[in-house]
């Protein structure tokens, strides 16, 4: 395998924080400036949907002074009810985050709206979106299969809610919080298993951590939200791919600068360090309420097999599972995952997608309803292998790293889908290759 070395300052801005900064800016009173906003397709879909719903948004590209081009987004809004009835369906493209969180906002607006997406998003489950919003008084209709289009007849008279999350989901938590901001009174979200907490941090919501590990999130409705600036750090989920590249490369060392180190986002780093990965964290500081720092990754030849089953750990690494599975398979020949049925409802059925493609590379795999196991590798693919991306950016990027590890020629069914979250993915790999 090649050697990869260098300092990376061009990781994509964090996808989750970019979504939320734009949505909160649309709910705030005044001018919200967001620096280092993501240029990924999903985040651009959020801006497009907000514009179609009547929010004034300006986006410009600026030189960051270190060779990077940084996007700055400026949002003008008059507060919670600044939205206008859309004249067209709100097109979320491939972004489940846009569709789900925007539903919470549209449920509080006194008009009809419709959220739609691309073919992949239109297959994803939306009942978990509709249930709490119906309890709050919004009229929501879905397809017979419980999927989009999400048709919303909103109301200014949303009721408060005490909602216990049935599964760990930062998107559902956020949509309930956004809806509750419009309700007359205090609402509470009960979170048995922690998920990423950017929404709570960025809105400054009160939280209570109970002795039993359950978190309560308190939302006081109908209070004005003051506009404030946001600075978006580098995306730790994108960093995971470069970490895998560095660990699998020969005599490699990569430094990833200014990465978000929110504990709810970097559980995969703990998993890798416990398995013996050569990872270090440096220059940790706080920016905008989020811990940020640099990640140093070095080649590692003794990585132990990854076995992940704890519900809390699974929730913390759910987006990184594709890369962790490929990394563990190539580094140790083994990988095991349980309690991750949520992966079957992502951009693709990621359990099936991983098993299908790992088998094409010669790995012996077995899948279950909630996970799968990689038992070893029987053959090494020497000819060109066709990798089916299933229109899923994380599958495409994970198996690009697999191609580097295998030294094989892989043909991706949809290379461009990486641009959903990581527009410069392929260029960055080439820039690090020695």
Curated annotation (Swiss-Prot):
- Cysteine pairs forming cystine bridges in this chain are none
Which CDD domains does UniProt cross-reference here?
Answer: EPSP_synthase
Q: Name one Pfam family in it.
A: EPSP_synthase
| Pathway assigned to this chain's UniProt record | Metabolic intermediate biosynthesis; chorismate biosynthesis; chorismate from D-erythrose 4-phosphate and phosphoenolpyruvate: step 6/7
Q: What is its main location?
A: cytoplasm
The residues that hold 3-phosphoshikimate are 15-16, 20, 169, 171, 195, 319, 346
Keywords from the named record:
Amino-acid biosynthesis, Aromatic amino acid biosynthesis, Cytoplasm, Transferase
Tell me the compartments it is located in: Cytoplasm
The record's listing under InterPro entries reads: Enolpyruvate_Tfrase_dom, Enolpyruvate_Tfrase_sf, EPSP_synthase, EPSP_synthase_CS, RNA3'P_cycl/enolpyr_Trfase_a/b
Picking any one GO molecular function of the record gives: 3-phosphoshikimate 1-carboxyvinyltransferase activity
Catalytic residues, per the record, are: 319 (proton acceptor)
EC class, as a word, reads transferase
Q: What is its EC number?
A: 2.5.1.19
Q: For phosphoenolpyruvate, which residues are the binding ones?
A: 15, 96, 124, 171, 350, 394
UniProt GO cellular component terms: cytoplasm
Q: Does the keyword Cytoplasm apply?
A: yes
Could you tell me which PROSITE patterns the record lists for this protein?
EPSP_SYNTHASE_2
User: Tell me, what does this protein do in biology?
Assistant: Catalyzes the transfer of the enolpyruvyl moiety of phosphoenolpyruvate (PEP) to the 5-hydroxyl of shikimate-3-phosphate (S3P) to produce enolpyruvyl shikimate-3-phosphate and inorganic phosphate.
List the HAMAP family: EPSP_synth
User: What family does the database annotate?
Assistant: Belongs to the EPSP synthase family.
- Quaternary structure annotation from Swiss-Prot or TrEMBL: Monomer.
This protein's name = 3-phosphoshikimate 1-carboxyvinyltransferase
């Amino acid at each position: 395998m090649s050697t990869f070395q260098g300092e990376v300052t061009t990781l994509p801005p964090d996808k989750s924080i970019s979504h939320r900064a734009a949505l909160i800016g649309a709910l705030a009173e005044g001018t919200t400036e967001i620096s280092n906003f993501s240029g990924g397709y999903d985040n651009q879909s959020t801006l497009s949907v907000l514009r179609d719903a009547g929010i004034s948004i300006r986006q410009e590209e600026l030189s960051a002074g270190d060779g990077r081009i940084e996007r700055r987004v400026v949002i003008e809004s008059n507060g919670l009810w600044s939205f206008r009835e859309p004249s067209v369906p709100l097109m979320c493209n491939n972004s489940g985050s846009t569709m789900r969180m925007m539903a919470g906002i549209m449920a509080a607006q006194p008009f009809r709206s419709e959220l739609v997406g691309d073919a992949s998003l239109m297959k994803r489950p939306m009942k978990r979106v509709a249930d709490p919003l119906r309890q709050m008084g919004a009229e929501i209709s879905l397809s017979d299969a419980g999927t989009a289009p999400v048709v919303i007849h909103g109301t200014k008279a949303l009721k408060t809610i005490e909602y216990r999350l049935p599964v760990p989901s930062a998107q559902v938590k956020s949509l309930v919080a956004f809806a509750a901001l419009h309700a007359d009174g205090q609402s509470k979200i009960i979170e048995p298993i922690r998920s990423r907490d950017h929404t709570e941090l960025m809105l400054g919501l009160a939280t209570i951590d109970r002795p039993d590990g359950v978190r309560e999130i308190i939302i006081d409705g109908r209070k004005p939200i003051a506009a404030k600036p946001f600075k978006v750090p580098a995306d730790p989920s994108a960093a995971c791919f470069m970490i895998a590249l560095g660990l699998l490369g020969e005599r490699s060392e990569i430094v990833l600068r200014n990465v978000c180190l929110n504990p709810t986002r970097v559980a995969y780093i703990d998993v890798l360090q416990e398995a013996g990965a050569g990872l270090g964290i440096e220059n940790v500081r706080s920016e905008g309420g989020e811990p940020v720092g640099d990640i140093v990754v070095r080649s590692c030849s003794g990585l132990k097999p990854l076995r992940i089953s704890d519900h809390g750990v699974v929730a913390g690494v759910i987006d990184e599972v594709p890369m962790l599975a490929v990394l563990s398979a190539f580094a140790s020949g083994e990988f095991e995952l349980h309690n991750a049925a949520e992966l079957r409802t992502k951009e693709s059925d990621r359990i099936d997608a991983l098993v299908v493609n790992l088998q094409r590379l010669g790995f012996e795999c077995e899948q279950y309803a909630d996970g799968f196991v990689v038992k070893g590798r029987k053959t090494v693919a020497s000819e060109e292998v066709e990798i089916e991306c299933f229109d899923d950016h994380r599958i495409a990027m994970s198996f690009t790293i697999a191609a580097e590890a295998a030294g094989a020629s892989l043909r991706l069914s949809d290379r461009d889908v990486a641009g959903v979250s990581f527009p410069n993915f392929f260029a960055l790999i080439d820039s690090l290759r020695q």
